[in-house]
Amino acid sequence: KYLISLSVFDQQGMVKGGDLSRYNARVSTEMNVLPILRFGINANMSYTDQNNANTSLFSAQGFRPDLPIYNDNGEFDMSTGQANPVANTYKKNHDNIYRIMGTVYGEVDIWKGFRFRSSLSGNLQFTENNSFSPSFLSTRNEASGSEYHYKYSKTVFDNTLNYNYEFNKNHVLDAVAGISFERGISRSTRMNGQTYPDNDIYTNLGSAASISSWGNGYNASGLFSSFARINYKLMERYLFTFTGRYDGSSMFGSNNRYGFFP
């Protein structure tokens, strides 16, 4: 069996510069190799193209109606002491977001109620952001811009053993035990530029006269878990549950990396 789906979402904002387009694709399939053996794949991919509005209807409603939008020279009037809602629509703030999520798994029925499942999952995301503020919005009459790049990846490897047993319909036992490995890494870079030659070359940060600031970030984390759960149902009226897990995480303190959680 298999499933394939495609979807498109397109939204035009009520304010200039605020629109969103998203494209999604999904693939899901499962194959019965043997009566006791199954393999499957689930994958989701998406692309988001988003322009973030830098003004709102509230700012337009709050703008004094007796103040001019343009001065006598036909330029935006920035001398009123109030943010010009029309001028602010010329700010640029654009996102490109790519996401891929997928899982590959296998299941095998071992013997009389015992089932083993192993799965490998991945999550990958790329984000690009470009912003630009024209010179007429600056008190120093200088255009400024920035670029931001973000990458995130996560891998999860799960292995579980399930057991289900029913006796005389009055006793039902359901148990699971397993181990899990998880790894996540993120990287980011941001650069800010000042004094562009004009308001049209906003997509090229290298055209700025100076790089006012820059920075990058890196973060990595890991998690190892072993866990177990037992559910016992008596006469379809009473349910008893016993759980426990033992986790080791790089997010814990260096002197206490592991902990038991009943």
Language-model features and meaning:
Residues 25-27, 118, 157-159, 224-230, ...:
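Extended, hydrophobic alpha-helical segments in both membrane/secreted and soluble proteins
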Residues 105-115, 119-121:
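N-terminal capping/interface segment
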Residues 1, 13-18, 24-101, 117-225, ...:
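Surface-exposed loop/interface segments of Gram-negative outer-membrane beta-barrel transport/assembly proteins
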